[in-house]
């Protein structure tokens, strides 16, 4: 009977011991400042921006933001829609390339980290559109991209699963223009086997880019640190040096950043 009582008492203590161990593990995974020991960031693969090998403007910028504060960058490459889902489920802390308030129940920092130049890719035989005339044409862009929420006249569209579908659809006259960030459009028509001379890209707008953080305590802490460090990098000139290292346009971001004091 005594042995049974002792066993029951031990079983009663197990949840408390497990909870204490979990809390200790969480505490060990924090920096001395109480921040998470790592920031888990997920992104679609973009050349010279967020490559799967850890190279690119976005990855260098995030290392400069977090690692001096003892927070290690843990990166992961996934398609855009899956990246958003991982953050929504708390399996990642943030994703790269969000537009502000694009997704509900996500924490957006105050400061953007880049500006997305948006272009319309079409056949050279097609007229050059303006933002005001785009609604006259058959448009397409990548699934999950919310261009229609941030640029007027982008209502009717096809959503594509793969960028590789865009050029055949243009060539077959199934769409008139493919909408995307200009660097992506340039990469498409500069690819091997593509005759760039039959296409043209028209700039139609720009949209500030943010990290989208998970709506939890980790996300709030990491977003707060991001805003603080962005100001430091901007005022020290390090932010501009990171952009220069990757030959990335910096001037469009300057009006959106805090004033230098």
Regions found by a protein language model. Give the residues of each.
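Bacterial N-terminal signal peptides
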Residues: 6-18
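Periplasmic-binding protein-like
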Residues: 43-44, 115-118, 190-227, 250-261
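Extracytoplasmic small-molecule ligand-binding "clamshell" domains
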Residues: 26-106, 140, 236, 246
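Flexible hinge/capping segments at coil-to-helix
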Residues: 121-139
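Ligand-binding clefts/hinges and TM-proximal coupling segments of bilobed small-molecule sensing domains
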Residues: 146-162, 196, 230-261
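A ligand-binding cleft/hinge motif common to bilobed small-molecule-binding domains
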Residues: 85-89, 98-106, 176-205
């Amino acid at each position: 009977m005594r042995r049974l009582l002792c066993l029951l008492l031990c079983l009663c203590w197990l949840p408390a011991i497990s909870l204490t161990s979990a809390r200790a593990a969480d505490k060990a995974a924090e920096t001395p400042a109480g921040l998470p020991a790592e920031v888990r960031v997920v992104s679609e693969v973009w050349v010279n921006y967020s490559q799967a090998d850890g190279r690119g403007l976005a990855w260098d910028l995030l290392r400069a933001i977090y690692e001096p504060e003892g927070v290690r960058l843990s990166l992961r490459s996934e398609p855009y829609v899956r990246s958003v889902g991982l953050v929504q489920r708390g399996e990642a802390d943030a994703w790269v390339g969000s537009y502000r308030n694009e997704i509900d129940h996500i924490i957006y920092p105050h400061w953007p980290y880049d500006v997305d130049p948006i272009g319309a890719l079409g056949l050279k035989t097609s007229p050059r559109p303006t933002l005001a005339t785009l609604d006259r044409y058959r448009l397409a862009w990548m699934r999950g991209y919310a261009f229609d929420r941030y640029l007027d006249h982008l209502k009717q569209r096809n959503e594509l699963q793969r960028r590789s579908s865009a050029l055949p659809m243009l060539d077959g006259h199934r769409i008139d223009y493919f909408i995307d960030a200009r660097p992506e459009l340039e990469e498409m028509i500069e690819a091997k086997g593509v005759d760039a001379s039959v296409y043209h890209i028209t700039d139609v707008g720009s949209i500030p880019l943010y990290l989208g953080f998970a709506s939890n305590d980790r996300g709030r802490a990491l977003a707060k640190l991001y805003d603080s460090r962005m100001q430091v990098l901007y005022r020290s000139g390090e932010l501009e040096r990171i952009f220069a290292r990757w030959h990335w346009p910096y001037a469009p971001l300057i009006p959106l950043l805090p004033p230098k004091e």
